[in-house]
Amino acid sequence: MRRFLAAVAAAVCLALPASAAQSPGYVALTFDDGPSGRFTRELLDGLYDRGVKATFLLCGYRIRQYPDVTQRIYEEGHEIGFHGYSHKNMKNLSRRDIASEILDTEALLPAGCHPVFLRPPGGCCSDSVRQVAQARELAILGWSVDPRDWENHDTASVEKKVLSQVHDGDIILLHDMSDSSVAAALEIIDVLQEEGWEFLTVSELARRRGAELRPGRQYDKFPEPESPPQ
């Protein structure tokens, strides 16, 4: 009887798609430059319908414009990180001005929201940015997949670039600033979920991989740690 059950179990496993037997991996979706009005709301609707949590790197001046959207991002369980107040290139700023970009944004965040990531606009980092991030106990967030959706407004092209490049542990850079970006993001989710991929916030992805986030250090992805040689 036991041998029969084992044979049945093996047959079932062989009959299942690969994604059903084992998840292809975990990825984190990140959205820069928001919040916006309609676009972010539509994105949040789509994420909610799909049960997906994402990480939003917000600009202070946009939080001031859309405090209700910011509150919704936070209340629906998404992660919030800093993207500066004014979206200036932080490589060109003094340490004092970099700190102000962070502090002025922090003052506008929902009560209880304490970001752990800073993503400098354009990914433009410098020693000064790293020093301020370290002093503010912030890790620097990079990315490993970038379809450049801010300049490429063809939804199918953005989707194809992401799907052709994505690997386990990737951090995907997108924006919630246009219809095409929102549509591409939701299409990407639909395809990857169908294949068995799971979506996490960046902090969740780091924890799953056992990564200790260090202030001032940059993280572009969180792949599965390599097994030690036998």
Where does each model-flagged region fall?
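Positively charged n-region of N-terminal signal peptides that target proteins for export
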Residues: M1-F4
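Bacterial N-terminal signal peptides
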Residues: A7-A15
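Solvent-exposed loop/turn segments at secondary-structure junctions
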Residues: D33-G37, Y61-R64, E79-I80, S86-M90, ...
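Alpha-helical scaffold elements lining the catalytic groove of polysaccharide deacetylases
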Residues: E42, K88-C113, G122-D168, S181-E187
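C-terminal domain-boundary segment and adjacent tail
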Residues: D49-R50, R64, S180-Q230
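Residue-level detector of anion-binding/catalytic polar loops
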Residues: K53, E79, A139, D146, ...
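Structural detector of well-ordered beta-strand residues that form the stable sheet scaffold
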Residues: T55-L57, G81, R119, L141, ...
